[in-house]
Amino acid sequence: MGKIIGIDLGTTNSCVSILEGNKAKVIENSEGDRTTPSIVAFTEDGEILVGQSAKRQAVTNPQNTLFAVKRLIGRKFTDDVVQKDISMVPYKIIAADNGDAWVEVKGDKKAPPQISAEVLKKMKKTAEDYLGETVTEAVITVPAYFNDSQRQATKDAGKIAGLDVKRIINEPTAAALAYGMDKSKGDSTIAVYDLGGGTFDISIIEIADVDGEHQFEVLSTNGDTFLGGEDFDLRLIEYLAEEFKKTNGIDLHNDPLALQRLKEAAEKAKIELSSSQQTEVNLPYITADATGPKHLVVKLSRAKLESLVEELVNRSLEPLKMAIKDAGVSVSDIDDVILVGGQTRMPMVQAAVAKFFGKEPRKDVNPDEAVAMGAAIQGAVLSGDVKDVLLLDVTPLSLGIETMGGVATPLIEKNTTIPTKKSQVFSTADDNQTAVTIHVVQGERKQASQNKSLGRFDLADIPPAPRGMPQIEVTFDIDANGILNVSAKDKATGKEQSIVIKASSGLSDDEIEKMVQDAEANADADRKFEEVVTARNTLEGLIHATKKTLEEAGDKATADEKSAIESAIAEAEEAAKGEDKDAMEAATKKLTEASSSLAQKLYAEQGAAGAGAAGAADAAADQPADDGAVDAEFEEVKEDDGK
């Protein structure tokens, strides 16, 4: 069996590593560098350049040089953040047929995984040149906060590059592996703060010595998939462009060549300001107008840069608070803080992290290489070369299905250790319903439509039965890559349907980064939504039961009673269409009162034996579940309910 290589597929830079003996080794590329820029260029003569060679020619070929493409994986073209990026990058971002954000190069439409595959090919070749043998298997890292479709897209990129991706592993977890492998035995809790080129993750990880085995257990993870070094660069680019516009009245955003030069200068200035207090951005002949050539010369201090990016640094602190809370630990329980990702070299970032945790981050972990090294260690675990390591990772976001009233009912909660399998029994919403749609969602919001839709499928041929009677068992099975398989089974017939969630379309805006934050910020709105849905479900259950009572025993009611009940039903149906909780509760009360005299007659007539049926109108408000079925039912599947 050949070596399983470890690849850190980064937004800005990528890195490849293998395990030699019991140590992870980072492999230098053909240019002699330990990291490779995640940049792909398409030249006039049809050549594809990757890495440093692509970066070198970017200024003369800006429209066909693609960088930070990882930020587009799983994103919708209409996403606000993608729209903002469009004006900031010199290459063309377009809408694919499914609404995803793709890129266009020399008239060809390309999906982000295709571009990422070119970088992976370079990593594969780097490893092959060093090992002197063909490499076919890899462990690839992704941001911990990547959703299901983004993970699937990363696997697809590996496939395009000719790699069998044995495992998708979270970047902070990989860094913890690299850090913890050679540490003395004993238990410790560490925080991995990973601020890379395009994404931010925080993971709280417990490293324990269990029966001589190194156990790495992720307690919680959080993050923001649209926060990274590229955003720091963009703040600086915006500032430089604005200063130039003030002086010369020319907007450099309209000039791809100037924009590319600005990007390079901004990145260089940002790096210089990590070790010096001041630098000068000097770009002669940046553009020209009727009066002649124009030059950009701007003096930049570290303090100015810090004022431009302060909001970005602060944005990374909210996920820290959530991760600590979700892990069930306090800041004082954290033994070590590990910094990962090139952007953590910025003194302001280091100071903010040190202040939050009340201790200095460790300096003995290489922020550019730790992730790839951890991936190589995981590869060796999978191939059996390393036997004393157990890695327990988690799923970053809750997974569930949409149930009656548009509620997202979670089956697997966020921060659940994976792999895992969970089943729950649901039922139908209508009498004689013969099909249900299973709509799979990912996220923390109570309202299904506010979460990321991962896919939907139908379970048909359910035998006709009263609502609430069929037993439909929904099973979620999430593998060690964090990729989901969902099945639904009618327990009466044994008929089953399943779906492996595929990356059919990506995120609609910066959803994934906002999911948990939104859930917190919108907790009040979510609570009100839940209350409205509960009131509506109660009212609709009562309407259904009362109508049934009228049909079966309407002749027992006087004309006045019947008229009052029908009037109350009409009012209740109208109230159920709205969003007013108070109106629904009032309608429930009125309908209960209107039907109570008929219910009492039936009760008196039928005695104890008929109590269940007679009380239906009164008790429907409580909606008891049948045979353990959860009272969150499916809507009936509609023929036109396509994607």
Curated annotation (Swiss-Prot):
Top-level taxon of origin: Bacteria
Presence of the UniProt keyword Chaperone in the record: yes
Pfam families associated with the record: HSP70
Residue stretches of biased makeup (Acidic residues): 624-643
Region named Disordered: 608-643
Modification Phosphothreonine occurs at: T199
PANTHER family: HEAT SHOCK PROTEIN 70KDA (PTHR19375)
UniProt-listed HAMAP family: DnaK
Functional description taken from the UniProt entry: Acts as a chaperone.
Protein name per Swiss-Prot or TrEMBL: Chaperone protein DnaK
